[in-house]
């Protein structure tokens, strides 16, 4: 490989290297803000280090959490049940999700349009997690593994404006 080719490869590699080492956008946000668990198993600890004991082990990928504080690579989080503790930032994603809330057996409906009289197209039990793509006028568009519909904003946790 000649010198001109190696310079060309180096110039292509530098932006890729810079992108790979860049800090995620989520790490730059100021709390409070929303995030979601991004691993099949995530530990909530009593403090911001692996030296602190584990309080909870979450096995719900995409579960929404509220970020309350930051300390280096650690985030103080609150889960849908109100439990607070610390998680490493690599366990979290900036993808905004929500969990359906309500009493056991209380089904929430997803509608075709953001209106109380719109056609019911899906039903979701409390605990179902989906991705939020928009929230307006008391309704959020929720995507649960490709099944999309509008759900009343008070029927989910993980959507309210923060700050």
What is the meaning of each model-derived region?
Residues 2-13:
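Bacterial N-terminal signal peptides that target proteins for export
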Residues 11-21:
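Bacterial N-terminal signal peptides
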Residues 25-46, 57-61, 68-71, 75-83, ...:
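SH3-family beta-barrel domains
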Residues 49-52:
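Second-shell loop/turn segments in exported
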């Amino acid at each position: 490989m000649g010198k001109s080719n190696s310079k060309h490869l180096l110039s292509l590699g530098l932006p890729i290297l810079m992108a790979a080492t860049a800090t995620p956008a989520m790490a730059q946000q100021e709390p409070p803000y929303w995030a979601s668990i991004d691993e099949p198993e995530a530990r909530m600890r009593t403090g911001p280090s692996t030296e602190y004991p584990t309080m909870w082990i979450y096995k719900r990928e995409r579960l929404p959490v509220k970020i309350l504080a930051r300390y280096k690579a650690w985030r103080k989080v609150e889960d849908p049940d109100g439990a607070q503790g610390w998680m490493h930032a690599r366990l979290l994603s900036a993808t905004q999700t929500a969990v359906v809330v309500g009493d056991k057996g209380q089904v929430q409906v997803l509608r075709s349009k953001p209106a109380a009289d719109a056609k019911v197209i899906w039903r979701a039990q409390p605990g179902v997690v989906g991705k939020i793509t928009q929230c307006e006028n008391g309704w959020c568009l929720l995507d649960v593994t490709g099944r999309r519909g509008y759900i009343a904003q008070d029927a989910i946790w993980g959507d309210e404006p923060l700050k």
